[in-house]
Amino acid sequence: MKKKAAWIPWLTGLCMSTALMAAIFLFGDLKYAMNDDTAILRQYMGFGTGAIPEAHAFLHPLLSTPLRWLGLAAPEVPWFSWMQLALLWLACMVSVKALMQCFAKRGFSMALGAAAGAGYLTLFGMTYACHVTFTA
């Protein structure tokens, strides 16, 4: 792959990942796959005790600390859900980029890699994006 074309996999991954998330938001039914996620979401919105926890047993401090700050600033926003969706969007984008680069490195066209990325997002990425879970 030429240096000039290095941005093409990133842009393609960005567009495909954004299109996937837009399609899910428009036509899909986003829900939590496990009840653990709902409990975490509610705790970081202040349900139950009325206080937002400083730490959570299931979350790494690098995730729980910003969630606490965001929850204190605007508790009505489901920050845990938005964080999960943003990380899924990023993972889908990087997956498409990696597939395109692998195809290009082996002498195939990037368009074939983009088609493989679209298939990957359709068959695997959509499942995790529709049934959000922190354990996936």
Q: Where do the model's predicted regions map?
A:
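N-terminal membrane topogenic signal
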Residues: 1-15, 107-108
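Extracytoplasmic loop-helix module adjacent to an early transmembrane segment
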Residues: 9-56, 68-72
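Specific aromatic-rich, kink-prone transmembrane helix
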Residues: 45, 94, 135-136
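Short hydrophobic/aromatic helix or loop-helix immediately within or flanking a transmembrane segment
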Residues: 53-78, 82-86
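Hydrophobic, membrane-inserted alpha-helices
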Residues: 64-68, 93-94, 114-122
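Transmembrane-helix motifs of polytopic, lipid-linked glycan transferases
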Residues: 86-106
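Transmembrane-helix signature of polytopic, membrane-embedded enzymes
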Residues: 99-121
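Aromatic- and kink-enriched transmembrane "portal" helix at the membrane-lumen/periplasm boundary
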Residues: 114-136
